[in-house]
Amino acid sequence: MSAPILFPLSAPESSFTIAGRLFHHAWPVLVAQLLSMSMLIADTVITGRYGTLDLAAVAVGSGVYISIVMLLVGVLQAVAPTVAHHFGARRVDAIGPALQQGFWLALMLALPGIALLAFPGFLLELSSVPADVAGKTRDYLLATAFGLPAVLLYRTFYAFNNALGRPRALMMISFIVTSTHIPLAWALVHGAFGLPPLGAIGCGISTAIVNWIAFACGAGYLAHNRDYRPYRLFANWQPPRRRDLLALLKLGIPMGLSTFIEVSSFTLIALFAARLGAEAVAGHRVVANLAALIYMLPLAISIAILVLVGQAAGAREPARARATVRVGMGLTVGLVALIGVLLWVGREPVVALFSADPAVRAVALGLVFYICIYQIFDAVQTVAAHALRGYKVTFMPMLLHALCFWGIALAGGYWLAFHAPGREQSPTVAGFWEASVVATILASVLFGWLLRVVMRRPQNVQT
């Protein structure tokens, strides 16, 4: 029995057709990402109304939790290009085993992740978290640890479903999870519906519960959807295979580290910015939130590019892969540039939505220009990095991410903010954004160069 082919794999495609396929895949991913962001915002609002210590605990704890999860989830993203290549090559019998090995890897990665969440003492000491906040943070992280296996298993399903070009299920599951988490977290934190008020730990418990709900929905979808039957996903279950696991790790560890490098660089920038005072760090946070929100669009399109490039590479159709990169790059940069122009024109009312404090708004308005430029070049490097993942090239991109985000954005930003000529006595958070712009410009050049090299390889230029 042949697998259902979701996209044409051999017919010539126009740029409009490719753009349509990218939009078809990207918009459900974008909605799913925005729903996930709304859960983090909800946790902040819910605990903020409960108490300052609990809000601080969730702020610190969620930063630790997200860093650990993104590192491990990044490794599991290796399932996406692996399955996309199998799908493009119509290796139906290899698709089910690839998912099974991904699930095994998720369970293995859960062990060190649980240990870090259950015993975060050294991480909190490094951050110099006050004792009263640290206690609540430990409780929050311990609660989230119970849901870590579920979130890793679900993210394996997430990568698998993306690779097959079926992102709408991810959007629906994200809607279910978000609509469950918000009232559940409120009830657990504040003690509604007869439950005792738990404070910060309530958000952690709710996060763990909805992670298991997400995985249950994903597993149920795989088990009962007819389109997946040819892949025999749960039949002939295979034990962990050393060769397959090593292949996933070889591909996934650089992906996980790349994600961790980006996340940690912005986390550390926020910590360094805190030295500049409440107004500076609050203004930085406003602009960082805007940047994160805008980033969801190029990230969603880039995920679609990864999948379509991976499918084309697996099908040995390099012309289609190159066309996907070309159209995807133009589409993404064009949209982000438009958003940047609109943000610049409407910067004052947009910033006013985030803060009523004139001092905070003044800092944020002084930084808006930087993110308008930053987002354009960040979109270029994001598309290029994901296209390279579609070609199963991940190690060199990891090194480039380290150079640009740790070496320039973080280290260079620290120097520009605190030690650049004229700023020793009047440090400014703008230094970090100046360095970030330089870092993304360099990243866009280096990633663009590497992508061109990869696309010109003999196996990627045949027609």
Curated annotation (Swiss-Prot):
It is found in: Cell inner membrane. The chain crosses the membrane at residues 59-81, 102-124, 139-161, 173-195, 200-222, 251-273, 288-310, 323-345, 360-377, 397-419, 429-451. GO terms for cellular component: plasma membrane. InterPro entries: MATE_fam, MATE_MdtK, MdtK-like. Its main location: membrane. It is a multi-pass membrane protein. Keywords: Antiport, Cell inner membrane, Cell membrane, Ion transport, Membrane, Transmembrane, Transmembrane helix, Transport. One of its GO terms (biological process) is monoatomic ion transport. Multidrug efflux pump. PANTHER family: FMN_FAD EXPORTER YEEO-RELATED, MULTIDRUG RESISTANCE PROTEIN NORM-RELATED. NCBIfam families: matE (TIGR00797). Belongs to the multi antimicrobial extrusion (MATE) (TC 2.A.66.1) family. This is Probable multidrug resistance protein NorM. The gene is norM.
